[in-house]
């Protein structure tokens, strides 16, 4: 009887779940979808919400955010390369600049596909002066990405001062590296995202470097295990010619990323001893299996130590 | 229901509480199914009579109160809250005592609780719970973890047979989350949950507690290994796939499959 009452109450509560609450729930699940799995999450949540209008609202809000946050890469319709979905290349909510080929891709966020391509206008591209720096860095970075990432995609954007056409001014470039592996048939997905910001400063003649790397991995065969890591870096180098800057900046990126990978390996190596052991040991402190057959002994010992006032 | 469970294996285990409460509000008619199929990290309460902590689950709950295994009373107080039979309570007391020692030996800290109650048939069900905070601010002896939680839930159905044996069916869930943070490696976060089942027919000569204890010990060790070797190994493999370590220093990853 009590159960029936509870259920009736809860059913009543459901009726009060407003459209906004339902949509918020859908947005929450979509926003927390692991990399490469948003379409599966979308399918589930669409079924559960049972209201396509609300689902569409949630999807049109969540997919662009998810695609940008995960630096989704999409193949261009002419197969000439890939465009990275990132705020740094966003022209409007469905158009993204691909700086290497100076094209703008039209993107369907929910289908996660490029639907169109046009040449970028002059307004959308940096000045020839800035382009020299951007282009040189892109070339060097491409070489590095090709050698370090089996499936890495990179792009370099000018995010400040793109119209500067003479030396003597500050400007910023941002380099993005995005590598992902989707293998739903093997129950695993993962991604590596690097964002490197280079601030070219005229007064100090230095380039300030800020980096952020995030890695995510999800393995879910008969379980659910997720890795997420994040690290930030700061560095600087001398403001030089476009070519020299490109080589120097790429070396710095390579150095930090390799070091970071090594520190991750070290974390994994320490996992069994120093980390896992603080949760549960592999063997008891006695280093032998627990003597279940002899537990009476424990009770006696415990009583004895209690009486003698020793132990716990 | 299928869609709901699929979501639960996709959303990070660190966010399972929010995910479950969202699903419960969306699917009130499936609340008991969801609650029985989705495990969450355990909550702790204090038995103010014995001044000892105990763990909360559906099996020691009645209305909004939970029965403590130490004093056998409900907190907050509840009149007429169901209690196990005298015979089962005796086993429960012993199980709690022995399981505390087991927990201390494997976990070097933590909280454990055992609840036993009559089954519909002639058998009984026992639920063994362990919670450990292994972070450096908690009970992590080595102090390497910024955050480290381990929750184990073992539910074991026991059906004694005529011939002096009993059928034991164990369902175990382990949930864990660990995080380290330092200058060179930034934040490193691993979270996971797995659930497995195992059934055995055993002679009750040495007693139920002995049989249940051995099964749980065996299962916990298997699940721990599986998480450490297979599941965490797979995430490491993924990192190496995305950006392989330079040749020469490549550390070989053993091919492994989950149990």
Regions found by a protein language model. Give the residues of each.
Chain A
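Surface-exposed short loop/turn segments
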Residues: 131, 135, 139, 143, ...
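Generic hydrophobic, helix-prone segments enriched in Leu/Val/Ile
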Residues: 29, 59-66, 194-200, 246-254
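A structural "domain/chain start" motif
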Residues: 3-153, 163, 265, 269, ...
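Generic detector of ordered, mature protein regions
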Residues: 58, 62, 150, 154, ...
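Short, Lys/Arg-enriched charge-dense amphipathic segments
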Residues: 179-189, 251-257, 294-297
